[in-house]
Amino acid sequence: MAKQSMKAREVKRAKLVVKFAEQRATLKTTINDVNATDEDRWSAMLKLQTLPRDSSPVRKRNRCSVTGRPHGFLRKFGMSRIKVREHMMRGEIPGLKKASW
């Protein structure tokens, strides 16, 4: 189980990403616009750097919804591989069964 503080930190990051997404997108379009002046592009770059570091979607980490485990995360289920296996063995995930050949 992950510490509660780590789970809370990820929730905080997710909120920041949503809050600053539009502002970040407009600044990035200005920076990548070849028709914009160099001064505009430079000022947009400086404004982008003043935004909170955790507002970048790259910093968000996928975690298991049950345990908070950061590794072995399966996007389709939103859980770690360990919890997916446990739920699968109990028959709680429809259509999933242990492989045998």
From Swiss-Prot:
Annotated transmembrane regions: none
Claim: Disulfide bond is one of the keywords in the record: no
One annotated GO biological process: translation
GO molecular function: rRNA binding; structural constituent of ribosome
Domain of life: Bacteria
Keywords carried by this UniProt record: Ribonucleoprotein, Ribosomal protein, RNA-binding, rRNA-binding
Record's GO cellular component terms: cytoplasm; small ribosomal subunit
Pfam families for the chain: Ribosomal_S14
Subunit note: Part of the 30S ribosomal subunit. Contacts proteins S3 and S10.
Family statement: Belongs to the universal ribosomal protein uS14 family.
Function description: Binds 16S rRNA, required for the assembly of 30S particles and may also be responsible for determining the conformation of the 16S rRNA at the A site.
Protein name per its UniProtKB record: Small ribosomal subunit protein uS14
Native source species: Psychromonas ingrahamii (strain DSM 17664 / CCUG 51855 / 37)
